[in-house]
Amino acid sequence: MRVALDTNRLTDLFQGDSELADRLGECDEVWLPLMVLAEIQAGFYGGSQQHRNELLLRSFLVKPTVGIMFPTRDTAEHYARLFIQLKRAGTPIPDNDLWIAALVLQHDLVLITRDRHFERVPQLLRDYSAR
């Protein structure tokens, strides 16, 4: 299985969600969209355990099945189509989440998240399993 992690689930993982850790260990590929990396690092800078959290992130990123996804021109096209789709439906989602959805669709991944607003993107494969 090929998955992408949303920020809330990466946070859960770093807070010791062993069920999620086990599930991710069974995945062939685990991707972090660049926006998730930025959001998680912003949280570190505002938190009281910055050093601990940065160590957790580094140890996660060196796993052979884990990678970072970067937007490309194709991602921008996916973003634009989704933006118009959601605007016409009157159901926008936050900008970073729109970028995340575009990357996940572009690479045909399953998004592991707790954010229900991703349901507004029906073509997006989602996994809402949570603690």
Regions found by a protein language model. Give the residues of each.
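Short, well-structured N-terminal submotif of metal-dependent ribonuclease cores
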Residues: 1-36, 42-59
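Generic structural signal for small/hydrophobic residues in well-ordered secondary structure
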Residues: 6-7, 40, 79, 104
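Alpha-helix capping/helix-boundary segments
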Residues: 9-10, 75, 99-100, 117-118
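A general structural signal for well-ordered alpha-helical segments in protein cores
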Residues: 37, 53-57, 76-79, 97
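Short, hinge-like loop/turn segments at secondary-structure boundaries
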Residues: 47-51, 86-87, 128-131
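Active-site neighborhoods of divalent-metal-dependent phosphate/nucleic-acid chemistry enzymes
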Residues: 67-112
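Acidic, PIN/NYN-like endoribonuclease modules and their adjacent C-terminal/linker elements
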Residues: 101, 105-131
